[in-house]
Each structure stands twice: as structure tokens, then as C-alpha cells.
UniProtKB/Swiss-Prot annotation:
It is a peripheral membrane protein. Pfam families: Complex1_30kDa. Keywords: Membrane, NAD, NADP, Plastoquinone, Quinone, Thylakoid, Translocase, Transport. SUPFAM superfamilies: Nqo5-like (SSF143243). This is NAD(P)H-quinone oxidoreductase subunit J. It catalyses: a plastoquinone + NADH + (n+1) H(+)(in) = a plastoquinol + NAD(+) + n H(+)(out); a plastoquinone + NADPH + (n+1) H(+)(in) = a plastoquinol + NADP(+) + n H(+)(out). The keyword GTP-binding does not apply. It is found in: Cellular thylakoid membrane.
Length: 176
């Protein structure tokens, strides 16, 4: 929290949140508003232990389609991020101006890199979560098939991490 927010009341801070962030907060789901992106989509972050609850609530609010799930690395020694882009494919009176939302989970590289799988909420998250695991090493708890999807099963390391050291030698294997 910055210095300006220290002197503000909790009501003033709640008013600074985006519409969806404020609604989650009022429903008891702790989150941090990250403002809006360059095209006006509301961004928010949640702790890993609140992700499943937050996404379940967002689906109830009308964000009924997981358009994209992925990961990225902020840089060597910095955090890994699992992100979720949800959109609404139906009109909801309460949220008619809001059609999409982005949720991020920030993970410290040297701590537990686990987040809940959203497979039970969105079946389409299956391969997206597997790809994020395969490239960044973020584990998705309770995923029905937590295996590599792009790299060979015995591959070591996470190729899209900024601190990944590329091996000098690759053993090519015939697929047959």
C-alpha cells in the first residue's frame, strides 16, 4: 500500500477499486485492484489460496468464459505470474458495462509455486494450465492430468523462465 493510502479510510480505499474488485471485496474475497489496462479492462490480483473462490464468484457474476490462462516471468529473481482473462458471453444487468476482467496471481520464485486448478469451474483450462506448468513450473493443485504437454516427459527445467539455462546437448529421439 502506498503512503497516500495510509491516511485514507477503508471506505475511501474501497471506492478506488474497480467495480468487480469492489464487489469481490464486499463478498469477503480479498483482492488488490491493479487499475485498468491500456484498453480499459479491469485488472486485479488475488492470493493463490483465494483464486478458486474469486473465479467461482466471477463466474456467478456472469464472467462465464475463460478466454485465456497463461503465465509469465517478471525476470530473474522476480515473481512468476499466473493470469486469467475472463469474459462475459451473456448480458448481466448489474455488469452490463463490464464485459471482461483479468485476474493475476503473483508467486515468489523461491516459494511454493502452486495455485488451485480451475478445471472444475472451466473445463477449457485443462491444456492451458498444463502448458503453463510445462513452460514455467507453476503447479495446478487438483488438476486431473498434471503432465507436460509440449516438452518430453523427462525434460528438466522450465524453458520460458528468464533464469532457464539452455542445455548444450539435446538427445533427439525417434518418435517411432
Amino acid at each position: 500500500m502506498d503512503q497516500n493510502n495510509l491516511s485514507k479510510s477503508s471506505e475511501e480505499i474501497v471506492e478506488q477499486r474497480g467495480i468487480v474488485s469492489n464487489r469481490l471485496y464486499k463478498d469477503g474475497i480479498t483482492n488488490n485492484s491493479l487499475g485498468n489496462d491500456h484498453i480499459g479492462v479491469e485488472l486485479l490480483s488475488v492470493k493463490p489460496e483465494k483464486l478458486y473462490e474469486a473465479i467461482s464468484s466471477l463466474k456467478k457474476y456472469g464472467f462465464n468464459y475463460l478466454q485465456c490462462q497463461g503465465g509469465y516471468d517478471e525476470g530473474p529473481g522476480k515473481r512468476l505470474v499466473s493470469f486469467y482473462h475472463l469474459i462475459s458471453l451473456q448480458d448481466i444487468e448489474e455488469l452490463e458495462e463490464i464485459k471482461e476482467i483479468r485476474v493475476k496471481v503473483f508467486l515468489n520464485r523461491d516459494s511454493d509455486l502452486s495455485v488451485p486448478s480451475l478445471y472444475k469451474i472451466f473445463k477449457g483450462s485443462d491444456w492451458q494450465e498444463r502448458e503453463t506448468y510445462d513452460m514455467y513450473g507453476i503447479n495446478f493443485q487438483d488438476h486431473p492430468n498434471p503432465k507436460r504437454i509440449l516438452m518430453p516427459e523427462d525434460w528438466r527445467g522450465w524453458p520460458l523462465r528468464k533464469d532457464y539455462i539452455q542445455p548444450d546437448f539435446y538427445e533427439l529421439q525417434d518418435a517411432y
